[in-house]
Amino acid sequence: MPSLPAPPAPRLLLGLLLLGSRPASGTGPEPPALPIRSEKEPLPVRGAAGCSFGGKVYALDETWHPDLGEPFGVMRCVLCACEAPQWARRGRGPGRVSCKNIKPQCPTLACRQPRQLPGHCCQTCPQERSNLDPQPAGLVFEYPRDPEHRSYSDRGEPGVGERTRADGHTDFVALLTGPRSQAVARARVSLLRSSLRFSVSYQRLDRPSRVRFTDPTGNILFEHPATPTQDGLVCGVWRAVPRLSVRLLRAEQLRVALVTSTHPSGEVWGPLIWQGALAAETFSAILTLEDPLQRGVGGIALLTLSDTEDSLHFLLLFRGLLGGLAQAPLKLQILHQGQLLRELQANTSAQEPGFAEVLPSLTDQEMDWLELGELQMVLEKAGGPELRISGYITTRQSCDVLQSVLCGADALIPVQTGAAGSASFILLGNGSLIYQVQVVGTGSEVVAMTLETKPQRKNQRTVLCHMAGLQPGGHMAVGMCSGLGARGAHMLLQNELFLNVGTKDFPDGELRGHVTALCYSGHSARYDRLPVPLAGALVLPPVRSQAAGHAWLSLDTHCHLHYEVLLAGLGGSEQGTVTAHLLGPPGMPGPQRLLKGFYGSEAQGVVKDLEPVLLRHLAQGTASLLITTKSSPRGELRGQVHIASQCEAGGLRLASEGVQMPLAPNGEAATSPMLPAGPGPEAPVPAKHGSPGRPRDPNTCFFEGQQRPHGARWAPNYDPLCSLCICQRRTVICDPVVCPPPSCPHPVQALDQCCPVCPEKQRSRDLPSLPNLEPGEGCYFDGDRSWRAAGTRWHPVVPPFGLIKCAVCTCKGATGEVHCEKVQCPRLACAQPVRANPTDCCKQCPVGSGTNAKLGDPMQADGPRGCRFAGQWFPENQSWHPSVPPFGEMSCITCRCGAGVPHCERDDCSPPLSCGSGKESRCCSHCTAQRSSETRTLPELEKEAEHS
């Protein structure tokens, strides 16, 4: 059947305008509830795949049932899909949402009394309740998908990643070779939610230009620029993977290729296959040809140590070694500096080009050589060395980050001091471990820092490395552990080690953290700067918290803030209510930006319209990251943030000529070089057309001879007092300031104000500047990010909609609250009301029509107040079933007008019926009295015969 248009988002669909008051203190308020809200979703990325619907992002080919929110819930009989437009490249570009009514596809039932089961669109017969037949595709109930939305989260229909984890197939590997190259590469990918994180290591290959994913026929599904982070390692993320590509991955039909300048179609390639050995892999090897004349032959090995003995288990995959033979014996040798240590025989076939084996009982010397990367693996056909591949065994290369958050809750004897620690590690190919540890908030001197295993018994700990102490007068420890051994490196990569910090007051440990690998996410700040430690001792006043955390923050070339927060030690009561705020110095009034409210211990995201004041604080090192919980709403953890940039100038960051920006693993320019400070936060970027070397944001606006970044607001030169302009994606929108009627009979017109004010409010403006005001003497309005004097009334400006004349906000000086209300338009009796001015909120009857408003302003009326719902007026105490286009009347929802506010709720149906048969009403089932055919009327018998 033809697709119906996508239903609108719940707020616009229902027309419910949530009004209320929220505190607006000087340290930064929550945004007030406005009749129209600014867009919360991130701006769509050019070329990004997927669809945005109802505040969520869906991958191409993904289907879902739309959720209209309470009290309507999930529309079970409506199926939406994210479809790729015909003109777009396969798997790329924004999709198109198409929704259709699937109720006509329900099968015809033979029973007389079908039932509507919860979570289903189609009715079923009572006797089928225990053995339901499969419904048509799309008719089974699905919870709304919500894998990334955490307000970027963990409820609803399982996302792609959750379904994959349930199947046990999240990690895949590929051996990459080429018929015209001696190069060999190995690709490892992990499917996490709807993103594919990949790392590619290679040998004997010139610098690759791109990593390419294709289907079996060679169609390009995704490409990523290849920027190696170190010798022979490329990292990347494929976000919003289409479902078709996920199916290809699960079916082992997705292929990976490395593209070079000499081989634009791909120099080496291979299919991704699932291997259970990937979960335990801690060592690896890439085997290349020793004969310089051969091509297209190579192999990879996945190795791990046994948990109970010094035995090396491995899986070896190879290609081209059999030389066209269906089956051949192979010989595997383990060498050290050319001397043979071990030798194995194996039989393989062309259908299974690989085998698994065990090297039992490694000696202590062999374990040392394994740690140092000096063991060589050689594979050749038995009976002749004409084809021979070899490579050295090293610790597994990865794009993940080894890190640890140290907190008092994880100490061997938990303590609650407010101290915190943060550690970052780098594992080298020879087994050495470089560490950087930050410790803040301890009440006494740090006396010991050790890397150790989990204690098997009380006071029985195995220490692998004694770390250097803190630098004099600081809170940083930097050094290298060179004696971990092969077993220690194996345990490190298996997330089995802990970092313990002992102090004079707590010699056994005041802080302790689990060393874990953080999956690669594309966040460049992990690799070019240390994380910011978050501690309760840094909160003002200090909080003796047993939790801790650290965070990475960075500004990209468009001055967008990227952040990633990790926490540890939060108790069960705080787990569900955690928020992260970015603000200025503690105790000073100013904007406070909510980064994210989240559940669990980690959060990440991007802020694209950070306030200039906060950008300036970031550049000066006076910005703070504040973590609040349910038990500590004023702050549980805090850390000081410093990001050197020119973003406080209100424009783009411009790199100085001759300065080479270091590259992060994802290929983006890092932000570590210190750049000179720019002009003040309100200064625009002068327009210099044609100047080479200066990157320009395609969303920048050019107005009055100056460039303004996307989201910038300013007063234009032609009317600096009574106009406000905003840049919205290369478009400048200027609105006149509309003054609300003053509440006093004799207002005063100030020279520096556009709107007249009452005399007593004018006197409040004569006080010292607003930044010095106490929180109760003014309000900070997050809509246009400005301070308002007590008693001020104004029409709000909400990006990207601009001036909202249908709402009036008031600053309540006594409480510091911003209270916004929708303008109540009178009910008109004329048939054709008109809007006198395009900017007016309310319509009015035409002049000379001889009709007046039937009702005055409901907010000021003496009689009962009515309710306006979905464009209609309902009298006080009236009940009705709302109508939702294009689905019609919602018979299971009842709305009622009370005190001028509509209240809607779903009808409460009784528990499942115990009677044998029932009667189906518009929403709920109820039992009916059974009557014999003698007592039933003739029309009832005729109707029953028709249904039978």
Curated annotation (Swiss-Prot):
One biological process term in Gene Ontology: negative regulation of BMP signaling pathway
Signal peptide positions on this chain: 1-26
Q: Which keywords describe this protein according to UniProt?
A: Developmental protein, Glycoprotein, Repeat, Secreted, Signal
Q: How is it modified after translation?
A: Cleaved by tolloid proteases; cleavage participates in dorsoventral patterning during early development.
List all annotated glycosylation positions. N347, N430, N877
* PROSITE patterns given in the database record: CHRD (PS50933), VWFC_1 (PS01208), VWFC_2 (PS50184)
Coiled-coil region = none
Q: What SUPFAM superfamilies does the record point to?
A: FnI-like domain (SSF57603)
Q: Which Gene3D superfamilies match?
A: 6.20.200.20
| Residue ranges of the region described as Disordered | 143-165, 665-697
Location of this chain's protein in the cell? Secreted
Q: Which SMART domains match?
A: CHRD, VWC
Matches recorded under Pfam families? CHRD, VWC
Q: Do the record's keywords include Ubl conjugation?
A: no
Assigned GO CC terms: cell surface; extracellular region; extracellular space; presynapse
Q: Which residues form the VWFC domain?
A: 49-126, 699-759, 779-845, 867-927
Where the record annotates domain CHRD, the positions are: 168-277, 279-398, 399-520, 526-646
**One GO MF term:** syndecan binding
Which family, according to UniProt?
Answer: Belongs to the chordin family.
Q: What does this protein do?
A: Dorsalizing factor. Key developmental protein that dorsalizes early vertebrate embryonic tissues by binding to ventralizing TGF-beta family bone morphogenetic proteins (BMPs) and sequestering them in latent complexes.
Q: How does it assemble?
A: Interacts with TWSG1 and/or BMP4.
- This chain belongs to which protein, by name? Chordin
Organism of this sequence: Mus musculus (Mouse)
The lineage is:
Eukaryota, Metazoa, Chordata, Craniata, Vertebrata
